[in-house]
């Protein structure tokens, strides 16, 4: 079996722009290990002839080819990080090839937000694929997707590995003499460690914004000023003059005490290595995120509302701000002392996400074999 996965290339690209760009290579690496997969190609949906420099060596061994040039080179096309031309997909399917749309974003938000908020969004003809694959977090949207795309929808495992993070950490150490990862301090030096809390939500969708984390950090500061040294709000420069955001930010005690920094977008490892000690997050119906995994791998206290993470990090339910504040204060008091057990718990969780984990390889093998065993899904009722 020969498989093509879509990627989007553009000038000035780097792998830290979003998690999706990394996920392509996690999937490609997994598929290449399957015994019945002969080759994995990258379908170039952009305007560059090469992958970003920071993708190497993860991109090594994967040919980057324009989709139209792979018609006779692949048996399965996976639309993932770049939109594929529907006429070409029709041609593929007419030849008996299979097409999968791997939906990694939150599908309801992607459908609704562009219309309501006047945002640009990618759109293509719905009836273009044989199956849709989603991450387990989006299982509740399967009926919606089946209705829209007129094809079956299935879960596939979330994949992650630390290769990109480790490479970035190596560059930071070599070029800037800074170390990635949380650095515990001897307990005798403090009762509550004054944490530099970082909020790294992208603020481009209602599913992941900084509002709840801001309130959690401020509630923690009001309850115990010794627990919070600073609040760093990344991806907020574009909102700093919006009246609603200004009103929210100015209401915080942290702002009144000049302890808030409003920042543009930065890569996780580069920023946390220099300016952060803890990560405070919030999500709505999108609890599988690369940010969480990067934070756990670095040993940083992760205050989150993701049930998916289980016992990893510091969990608070839903949008429970008092609970989140208590977990942040708990991290301030106990994280250094419990650092080793925190790292062990995180490592156990992260290991299960590896593209080389047998359970993940088995799940994707079954998905591909199911996909290619059905002659014509469109005829089914």
Which residues does each predicted region cover?
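Nucleotide-activated donor-dependent transferases that construct or modify glycoconjugates
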Residues: 1-17, 195-202
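Extended catalytic core of nucleotide-activated donor transferases of GT-like folds
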Residues: 6-10, 25-131, 138-143, 263-268
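Conserved catalytic-core segment of nucleotide-activated headgroup transferases in glycan assembly
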Residues: 20-23, 158-255
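Short internal beta-strands
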Residues: 39-45, 134, 229-238
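A short, active-site helix/loop in glycosyltransferases that binds the activated sugar's phosphate group
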Residues: 111-180
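Donor nucleotide-activated moiety binding/catalytic core segment of transferases
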Residues: 239-297
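Catalytic binding pocket for nucleotide-activated donors in carbohydrate/polymer assembly enzymes
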Residues: 274-354
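A charged, aromatic-enriched C-terminal amphipathic alpha-helix characteristic of glycosyltransferases
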Residues: 335-381
């Amino acid at each position: 079996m020969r498989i093509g996965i879509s990627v989007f290339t553009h000038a000035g690209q780097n792998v830290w722009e979003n998690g999706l760009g990394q996920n392509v290579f996690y999937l490609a690496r997994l598929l290449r290990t399957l015994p019945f997969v002969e080759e994995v190609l990258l379908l170039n949906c952009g305007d560059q002839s090469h992958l970003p420099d920071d993708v190497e060596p993860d991109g090594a061994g994967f040919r980057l080819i324009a989709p139209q040039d792979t018609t006779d080179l692949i048996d399965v096309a996976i639309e993932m990080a770049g939109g594929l031309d529907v006429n070409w997909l029709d041609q593929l399917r007419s030849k008996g090839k299979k097409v999968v749309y791997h939906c990694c974003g939150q599908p309801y938000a992607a459908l609704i937000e562009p219309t309501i908020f006047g945002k640009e969004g990618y759109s293509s003809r719905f009836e273009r694929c044989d199956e849709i694959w989603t991450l387990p977090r989006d299982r509740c949207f399967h009926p919606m997707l089946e209705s829209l795309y007129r094809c079956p929808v299935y879960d596939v495992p979330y994949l992650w590995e630390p290769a990109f993070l480790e490479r970035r950490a190596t560059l930071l150490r070599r070029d800037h003499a800074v170390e990635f990862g949380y650095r515990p301090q001897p307990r005798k030096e403090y009762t509550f460690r004054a944490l530099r809390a970082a909020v790294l939500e992208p603020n481009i969708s209602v599913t992941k914004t900084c509002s709840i984390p801001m309130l959690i950090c401020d509630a923690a500061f009001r309850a115990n000023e010794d627990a919070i040294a600073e609040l760093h709000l990344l991806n907020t420069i574009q909102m700093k003059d919006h009246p609603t955001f200004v009103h929210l930010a100015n209401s915080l005690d942290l702002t009144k005490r000049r302890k808030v920094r409003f920042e543009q977008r930065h890569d996780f490892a580069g920023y946390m290595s220099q300016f952060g000690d803890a990560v405070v997050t919030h999500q709505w119906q999108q609890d599988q995120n690369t940010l969480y995994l990067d934070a756990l791998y670095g040993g940083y206290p992760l205050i989150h509302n993701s049930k998916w993470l289980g016992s990893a990090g510091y969990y608070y339910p839903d949008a429970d701000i008092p609970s989140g504040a208590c977990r942040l204060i708990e991290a301030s008091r106990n994280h250094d002392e419990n650092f080793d057990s925190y790292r062990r718990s995180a490592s156990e969780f992260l290991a299960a996400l590896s593209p080389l984990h047998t359970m993940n390889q088995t799940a994707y093998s079954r998905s591909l074999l199911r996909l290619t065993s059905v002659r014509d899904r469109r005829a089914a009722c």
